Amino acid sequence: MKINTPKFGLNRHDTSSVKGYAADVARAESLGWDAAFLPDSQLRRRDTYVLLYAAAIATQQIVIGPLLTNPVTRHPSVTASSISTVAEHAQARTILACGVGDTAVRLSGLKPAKINELRDSTILLKSLLTGDPVEIGSGRPSVLPFRQDVPVWLAAGGPRTLEMAGGCADGVFIRVGTNIENIRIAALNINRGAQKSGRDPAFVKLGAVFHTVFVEEEDKAITMGKSMAAGYYEYSPMLLKNLNMHWTGPHPDLLKESEGIWPDFHHHANLEESGRVVDFLAPEHARSFALIGNAKSISIQLVEIISEASVLGIEFEYIVLQPIPNPPTPDPGPDSYLERVPKEIISGVKESLKSTHLGI
């Protein structure tokens, strides 16, 4: 059986300085990471495109880009200009991933983009990045004179957003956890959106963001995984319903208020603490929404997910292994997540997939 080997990306690097970020992405490239993604969150990190430009200059092969930006805090024309400038120094290895807005929006007191707004901004971005004249109310058509060919991806989890993304994006990053049933449903929604728009679903690439609790102590890892499951329920409760899993505790908003969880169950400063708040969830909840455990355990989970998806005709272009909890900044040395994961997990996963392809 032929199984596509995905590119593995990391979305947490040293953002304590521009120089530090460039060096950290170069370090990731040298250690075998295929992609380096950067959340666009202006109250948490330095300017996204300044950091990406520095990384572009410092590297040669690694794929770079924001994951994710949004049409609320930046107008699409500003984003198109910025990502094209980055791509001048990272041609054929820059991508742009957008979403409704996460911490960038919520921590600024703004509202996430609506689905129609995200769709319209995606169409505008694609037009600007392909050099097409666009009407944006300036009196005459606008053109980006230094545009670069940068693919526009969307990040999504809900069925309506996934369907919309399949109809207009070059690729879709799904954030639906690690259970193959939710992955199957997400791919189905993307394909449906592509078909409704007259597109061939095969041309819409797929990526996945997996929260990765790379923690040796199983009980501790499960507790953090429960916080991840709660975070998914907080924003996309249908993901539990799809798996016939139940939420037996108070509403997440009530728990956040009473227990001081901020800003949500995915981003709380102490994920063991937030995980204990939802201890009514079962270990299976945690395992359905995060990769959990030591290197061997996570490697097995990844190979199973990729193989099961391939049987269903689902191939991943990218898999982003988002570290849980966030690593320290900076995170130097051989014990760091950035150095351990390629050596202890990614290399073995790629070898296993290669062996499967060769029938070994």
What residue spans do the PLM features occupy?
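Hydrophobic faces of well-ordered beta-strands that scaffold small-molecule active sites
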Residues: 6-12, 36-38, 63-67, 94-98, ...
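An alpha-helical appendage that flanks or caps ligand/catalytic pockets
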Residues: 2, 111-143, 183, 188, ...
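Acidic (Asp/Glu)-rich catalytic clusters
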Residues: 26-30, 52-61, 83-94, 166-167, ...
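N-terminal beta1-alpha1-beta2 module of alpha/beta enzyme domains
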Residues: 1-68, 150, 358-360
